[in-house]
Amino acid sequence: MSSILPFTPPVVKRLLGWKKSAGGSGGAGGGEQNGQEEKWCEKAVKSLVKKLKKTGRLDELEKAITTQNCNTKCVTIPSTCSEIWGLSTPNTIDQWDTTGLYSFSEQTRSLDGRLQVSHRKGLPHVIYCRLWRWPDLHSHHELKAIENCEYAFNLKKDEVCVNPYHYQRVETPVLPPVLVPRHTEILTELPPLDDYTHSIPENTNFPAGIEPQSNYIPETPPPGYISEDGETSDQQLNQSMDTGSPAELSPTTLSPVNHSLDLQPVTYSEPAFWCSIAYYELNQRVGETFHASQPSLTVDGFTDPSNSERFCLGLLSNVNRNATVEMTRRHIGRGVRLYYIGGEVFAECLSDSAIFVQSPNCNQRYGWHPATVCKIPPGCNLKIFNNQEFAALLAQSVNQGFEAVYQLTRMCTIRMSFVKGWGAEYRRQTVTSTPCWIELHLNGPLQWLDKVLTQMGSPSVRCSSMS
């Protein structure tokens, strides 16, 4: 069957006229890629129009797009059951598409709620929000429904609203400055920093008996098992909100003003690269540090040259690599996708094998030991850092002195191993015993810590990796 569309209905042409352009061809081959993108967009719109004609909601979609009005009605399509497309759901993934959407060999609707259009697979509300509002949209984590949307994606109803004006982009919250007293005493040496590298951490599986600690700001979405495309319901969010009191946790209230001190506000600012990633094999650093500038990136085991959205470990060589490391590298596959959205960092396991994460910020949220290693199964994701939680901790630690603030440095470092886990329940008990692992440094929080420590009074001994 030819892939060329024989006829484009006028309504499809009108709707395509409102499509948002991503801008830029991306260099050589951009023309061909743009041509393929245009064809895909036309198929996506044509497919949607066909479904909406049967339900009489097509006029409402056109009204929403042309008026750009959020007060329009819901425009819904069935949210589950591949049978509605008259096609079976493929159970294998043929190819990873560079747009971040799964790629299959035929058009269908899968059981996980994702929509298949011409070799690309994604959540329907994300597809059409990208098409008509935000071409740079990467994930459903970046979207939240407006209050009057009755069929929002997160409500998990039989139908899902694809009205692009019923969704908003998640905004990064503005973190209030931390009020820091200027201390006159200068420390002669740095306090010892908790180091979990050589300790034997506890282990936990995700999901587990997770209950957020009441003295921390609730997650959005709240803690719980998050499937490949899942979010918890608003009811669960309200229950989570009842367990704590965010008003009591704001950095301003955690830093009581003492007018006898010389208090200076220290503000948070976003760096050009939100995180830096180093790759290790056992206890040996391999390759150069990857600096992440994009809100979404993958760390995988393939061999394509790395770009701003992809860190390929398959290209990296190591003369000391043994057979165990070689075998593990072959199983990294699609690896892990990292999102930095709205001041929150998520890790999604794309590999066929689990990933293992040690995130002190995440562990503190759930009341685990700071060194706990959490297993993330394939197709699941976990929030591994939250800027607002960190801001509250920082403001609280300022009142406890230089050492308490300095200890937060460890919270800005996240370790993650591929395929093989480590900890008390595993043969490998330290991260440096795992064949393949990465270490993330969150640059924004680290730079904020540096400014706060400088304001508090820098010690005379310089910080180093050995301190």
UniProtKB/Swiss-Prot annotation:
What happens on changing S467A?
Answer: No change in binding to PPM1A. Loss of phosphorylation by TGFBR1
List of residues that carry N6-acetyllysine: K19
Q: Name one GO molecular function term.
A: double-stranded DNA binding
Spell out the GO cellular component terms annotated for this protein, sorted alphabetically and separated by semicolons: activin responsive factor complex; chromatin; cytoplasm; cytosol; heteromeric SMAD protein complex; homomeric SMAD protein complex; intracellular membrane-bounded organelle; nucleoplasm
Superkingdom, taxonomy of origin: Eukaryota
Q: One matching Pfam family, short form?
A: MH1
Q: Where is the composition biased (Polar residues)?
A: 207-217, 233-243
**Domain spans labelled MH1:** 10-176
Q: Which SUPFAM superfamilies match?
A: SMAD MH1 domain, SMAD/FHA domain
**Which residues in this protein are found as Phosphoserine?**
S240, S245, S250, S255, S458, S460, S464, S465, S467
Outcome recorded upon mutating L440R? In a colorectal carcinoma sample
Short sequence motif PY-motif: positions: 221-225
Q: Where is this region: Disordered?
A: 207-251
Q: Which disease is it linked to?
A: Congenital heart defects, multiple types, 8, with or without heterotaxy: An autosomal dominant disorder characterized by congenital developmental abnormalities involving structures of the heart. Common CHTD8 features include double-outlet right ventricle, unbalanced complete atrioventricular canal, and valvular anomalies. Vascular anomalies include dextroposition of the great arteries, anomalous pulmonary venous return, and superior vena cava to left atrium defect. Loeys-Dietz syndrome 6: A form of Loeys-Dietz syndrome, a syndrome with widespread systemic involvement characterized by arterial tortuosity and aneurysms, hypertelorism, and bifid uvula or cleft palate. Most LDS6 patients have thoracic aortic aneurysm involving the ascending aorta and/or aortic root, but cerebral and iliac arteries can be affected, and abdominal aortic aneurysm has been observed. Arterial tortuosity involving cerebral vessels, the aorta, and/or iliac arteries has also been reported. LDS6 inheritance is autosomal dominant.
User: In which family does this protein belong, per the annotation?
Assistant: Belongs to the dwarfin/SMAD family.
User: By what name is this protein known?
Assistant: Mothers against decapentaplegic homolog 2
Q: Which organism is it from?
A: Homo sapiens
